[in-house]
Regions:
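Membrane-interface "cap" regions at the ends of multi-pass membrane proteins
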Residues: 1-58, 187, 207-217, 236-241, ...
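Hydrophobic, membrane-embedded alpha-helices of multi-pass small-molecule transporters
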Residues: 25-41, 187-194, 203-266, 285-304, ...
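Extracellular loop-to-transmembrane helix junctions
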Residues: 47-77, 99-105, 252-253, 439
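Membrane-water interface regions at transmembrane-helix termini and the short interhelical loops
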Residues: 49-51, 78, 94, 102, ...
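Juxtamembrane transmembrane-helix boundary signature
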Residues: 61-95, 104-120, 447-459
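Transmembrane alpha-helical segments of multi-pass small-molecule transport proteins
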Residues: 104, 133-163, 177-187, 212-228, ...
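C-terminal membrane-solvent junction of multi-pass transporters and transport-like membrane proteins
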Residues: 366-447, 463-468
Length: 477
């Protein structure tokens, strides 16, 4: 029986060779911007609009998004760009050659959650578009169509991704125009309703102004922290760090607060973050149809990138390394389809809690990776050791797990929950001054540095012995 052939380079989790990393700055920016500009921005804007006015909300959200994106770039960027690996593979030096399963599970849950949300949003918008065009009558029939449209969307994404990273880039080239349509919608509501927009007051604002501002920043941080699962699979295609940094900050980060202003403005003035509802009021039925077409198409770019990143992440599992790309795509898409078919309304209603839970997990993870790469390893990694396991290997630690990373992740998550309950949004007295994500990242970093120093002294984890390094420098001089 013939052995299955090795997967194509961009369909594997192996490090990409320089000749395989062909995405320039323009192509990477376009792909990242299309990925970022999904309709979740409206829901993010709606969440911020519950606590802050338009100007304050825009400033807080933008600041939070850039802070979160910087954490993600510092955490996953160096290893992913240097060696052409994905986000999951980049955690092996911290968690071990078995412990990386923990970040892999976090990646899968996050991407499944986001993609489910976007597919449900697509199905709902497609139903509204059909009603607006007179193709169907409004009523309960729309709810029955949501599962069918979910299956259709998953089939289209599956077909596009049969071509690997090329499929992601192709979808981005087609859908990039929707970013400008989104900016046009923002211009419409701002230009038509500016006096009302400035005078509008948020409905859920707390008496403490500081709490409201901090929550706006926290929502921005949590939003861009959710890019950690995606970023590695995209920037590994770039030839070097100089090519990747600006596209990440301007292409993957900036569109999120900009397009979130659509939802922020809509919920403040017209009590709805969905542009397809308020554009009918602003510009009539024609504008509403244009908006629905935009909303329907916008989510494909993000969902395609998410499915691709998740499928590449699955390649890190030894049992799936030789499986066909088609099999991996099906494994990745099936959970998304099941959520969209069986529990769309329940999942859609829990978006705020899902967004907070992302910050709980990924803020500590970023703190761990930044500390390990810049402080403990001093930017030295062994890429070969990431793909070999067993006793005596550099990243084997103890049984393939690094207890320092697991303890630090637990400490970071506990810090977040102590400061802000992600489900009820009840907070401690320190939260308005600190946020929750930043202390979670800092506490995880501190615990990891202290315990990681002990791991290094024990001679585990492939760290350079600090005393030996000093002797080597002295001998060299």
């Amino acid at each position: 029986m013939a052995e299955p052939s090795a997967p194509a380079a961009d369909e594997s989790a192996w490090p990409l060779l320089p000749s395989e990393r062909t995405w320039g700055a323009a192509r990477l920016t376009l792909t990242l911007a299309t990925t970022a500009a999904a309709t979740w921005c409206y829901l993010i804007g709606e969440s911020v609009g519950g606590y802050l006015g338009f100007v304050q909300g825009a400033m807080a959200l933008t600041a939070g998004c850039f802070v979160g994106m910087l954490l993600v770039l510092l955490a996953a960027g160096p290893a992913c760009v240097r060696f052409g690996i994905d986000s999951v593979a980049a955690t092996k030096p911290q968690f071990g050659t078995r412990g990386w399963v923990v970040p892999a599970v976090l990646q899968a849950v996050s991407i499944i959650g986001w993609n489910s949300l976007l597919i449900i949003f697509f199905a709902k918008s497609a139903v509204q578009l059909g009603v607006a065009l007179g193709l169907m009558a409004p009523g309960t029939a729309g709810a029955a169509l949501v599962p069918l449209l979910t299956i259709l969307a998953c089939a289209v994404i599956f077909t596009a991704l049969r071509r690997g990273a090329t499929g992601v880039s192709l979808v981005s080239n087609i859908l990039f125009v929707h970013v400008f349509v989104g900016l046009w919608m923002l211009y419409l509501i701002v230009s038509h309703r500016w006096p009302e927009l400035i005078a509008a007051r948020p409905a859920l604002a707390a008496p403490e102004r500081g709490w409201n501002h901090t929550t706006g920043v926290e929502l921005g941080i949590g939003t861009t922290l959710s890019w950690w699962p995606y970023i590695g699979a995209m920037i590994r295609m770039a030839p070097n760090g100089r090519t990747a940094v600006l596209p990440v900050m301007l292409g993957m980060c900036l569109p999120v607060p900009l397009l979130s202003l659509i939802g922020l403005a809509g919920v403040l003035v017209l009590k709805s973050s969905d542009p397809s509802e308020w554009l009918r009021t602003v510009g009539g039925p024609t504008y509403a149809v244009v908006s629905l077409g935009f909303v329907t198409a916008a989510n494909f770019g993000t969902t395609t990138a998410g499915i691709y990143a998740s499928a590449v992440g699955l390649r890190n599992f030894q049992a799936l390394q030789r499986r066909s790309w088609t099999t991996l795509l099906l494994v990745t898409i099936m959970p998304v389809a099941c959520v969209g078919i069986f529990i769309p309304e329940l999942f859609f209603a829990k978006f705020g809690s899902f967004l907070a839970l992302i910050g709980v997990a990924f803020a500590p993870l970023c703190g761990i990776q930044i500390t390990d790469y810049f402080l403990l390893r001093r930017r030295r990694l062994d890429v070969r050791a990431m793909y070999t396991q067993g006793p005596g290997q550099p990243y084997w630690f103890w049984g393939g797990f690094n207890p320092a990373a697991l303890a630090a992740l637990t400490a970071g998550c506990a810090t977040y929950v102590l400061l802000l309950d992600p489900l009820s949004y009840r907070s401690s007295a320190w939260y308005p001054y600190l946020t929750a994500s930043l202390p979670a990242a800092a506490s995880a970093a501190l615990v990891y540095f202290l315990l990681g120093s002990l791991v290094r002294r024990a001679g585990r984890g492939g760290y350079r012995n600090p005393r030996r390094a000093r002797h080597e420098r002295q001998d060299a001089t």
